[in-house]
Amino acid sequence: MPRVFGDNMVLQRDLPLPVWGKAAPGEVVTVGFAGQQKSATADAGGQWRVTLDPLPADKTPQILNVRGENEVVFTNVLVGEVWLCSGQSNMEWPLDKSANPEEEKAAATFPEIRHFKIPRTSSAFPQWNTKGSWQVCSPKTVGGFSAVGYFFARELYRQLDVPIGLINSTWGGTAIEPWMSPESAAASPKLADLQAKILLQSSHSPEGKKRYEEYLANLTQWVAATEAALVQDEPVTEPPAVPWPAWDNPQATQLYNGMIYPLAPLALRGVIWYQGESNGSDDAAAYLGRLEALISGWRMKWDQGDFPFYIVQLSNFGRTSEDGKTWTGIREAQVDSLTIPNTGLAVTIDIGDSKDIHPKNKQDVGKRLALWALAGPYGKDINPSGPLYKGHRVEDGKIRISFDHAKSGLLIGKKENLAAVTPDPGAKLRWIEIAGDDRVFQPAEAVIEGGEIVVFSPEVAVPTAVRYAFCQDPAGANLYNKEGLPASPFRTDSW
């Protein structure tokens, strides 16, 4: 049986439940759970699969029994909501290292929240299984949980009162490319550059085989030259670089193969995704193409339709990349991903840390992701998003900006640590700029009028463009809707 099946697991409610494994060819395997008995016969390769009928949420611990020539019994199994948490370090970041860890751990007696952590696994080939085990949430265990995942789960649990299962498949410092499926990368016309890289890193493609053969030839020459140099007591040169990646530097598709592929087709509700820092030099179009392909590939693998895929937008942070590029392109791509069906975006531009790429406030990140889930598959009548740029028009030397998700109105707010956003009377809108045809942006004034802002500057008589928080580290960005959710950075131009 795959390790994702185990004691303390949560099965997804209200969806067909695939259960699969390996046995001797021709062996009959029977799966029993919650009064159901389903059987399958292992094929010539030993693979078998049954699909249990959908079940309602159930907090009562039950037994999942799998019986063939041998018997496997999983205990303390609940039925509720299952979410996959993936990305790089800010999703991986444990509660132990987040804000108020001791207080949060002491209050974490939620035995119906469960967490499955997949070890870092990079593979050139799709893996059938993974390692890991399900843990019951308690003050003793929660410190190692994904902090974002835990606060997301806690909010869902409080609102839905059903068991919540989290699958934590993360690897700090990784770009998006290792998380993509080979099929989705190959199918996208936008990813020709990535397709070439995949071929080069594979020893089974003609391109990759040639690369390996060249390396072996160079290595042979180096060994001979080194032996001669040692005899003559001469300096030794560096050996040729190996053409495959180091263990801690996974390449395109390799984390999908090792950490995502083994999970499907386990029924789940959706995905929460926090990644992008390691693609910080990408422009918006390049990253968006990869994000589209990643989402498409995962949905294709699960074959559950367009399941929810909720993304954390990169927060403010003070350091730019070595090439001088900022995260503005990644943030734009993350906004543009909302054109993909059944996606959502948790904006965090107000809760970053200028000096730390790992901001400690994971509580608000989890809550903001949970708003999308509550408004989406769980049908709550709430606004899940902060203001998102909709359009603009020039009028009387000013530019009027309109927003989606601002029906309640806009406010200039103040966010301090974990406290709720409060109005900041008398404060001015920060990080707002305006430019004319010369494309030179000047600091601007802004007036809120309902769900719109009117932007102007005496330095720009004939304005053509506005930008808000459009830089690497707009610390103190303070535009919110009246639900207390921050506006995403935006620009009206494409310069």
Residue ranges and their predicted role:
Residues 2-495:
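Cell-envelope and extracellular/periplasmic
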